[in-house]
Amino acid sequence: MFYLKKYQKISMKILMSKNYFQVIRAGINTTFQDEGRKNLYHVGIPFSGAMDKRNYFLSNKLVGNKINSPALEFAYQGPLLKYFGNKINIAITGDVNFRIKKKDITIDGNCYQSLNLEDGDEVDILSTNKSVYGYLAIGGQIDLKYQWSSCSTNTKAIIGANDGKKLENKQVINISKLNNQSVERKLNYINTKIENIRIIKGTNFDYFSDKGKKIFLEKEFIVSKLTDRMGMRLEGPKIENIIDTNIKSEGLIKGVIQVPADGNPIVMLSDHGTIGGYPKIGVVISADYDKLVQLPPGYKIKFKQVDLSSAENLFKLYDLETQNLISQIE
């Protein structure tokens, strides 16, 4: 009996000292993401990972994590989380409206800086501002399940952290290890939007008529409401195909633009399938992908063609800019 009581006391002590977040409101589409699953296309496993890699990396750096640590990605409206435990730091990146609710005061939050939470504090992510995705990094190690060396959640394939599901109300996010909370980090950064999305020719570019190519490269398209982590549907003038709208299925990559029978292009995003049978007219260059995924429904875009060498150089420049931003965070 003595040992049972002693065990119960120890168990309660462990429970009370545990650091965790209680999910009060899960948000519209909140998932755990990291860099994604590399080198698995050949076995039918999508890449997944954070949609906007730059903002994801910055969120982790601001809380002192390795930049490829798991973080929460949310779309439009984020979660309302209540924290229990020792002091912890968080950071939110993107163009996001949020509040920190403490015992006696509610504070409007600022993105791109580390923020301390204490026992009983709440973080309420209200909305993204004329954009889609935001990131919440937690300073420490989140208890998560990994599959194929990644915790990235793909809800269509039902793989990754949280049993492949979106965050749900009332669930708990356990933190097994905390970072040093005394270091304050901040970055002066403003997200910008682009209207011209640069692309290279797709492997089936010549399957389209001259008129279809002209429409693709000169006309405006509107981001559809039928857009998710798997693909971005675009609405606008129909792109004419001169061979066949259904071809032998081929491998897909992130950013490739397929054109189905209705003539409306679809950009493959991070959770896309690994093969597809629609002609591929173009591929969004890697340097523009982060900004593309942040464009909300109703936003107008145009495509601009560049050659492969330019696409490679533009990505090197974008990657260098990202690394410079990371290095500015002490």
Q: Residues of each region from the PLM?
A:
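Conserved "landmark" site that anchors the functional core of diverse proteins
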Residues: 2-330
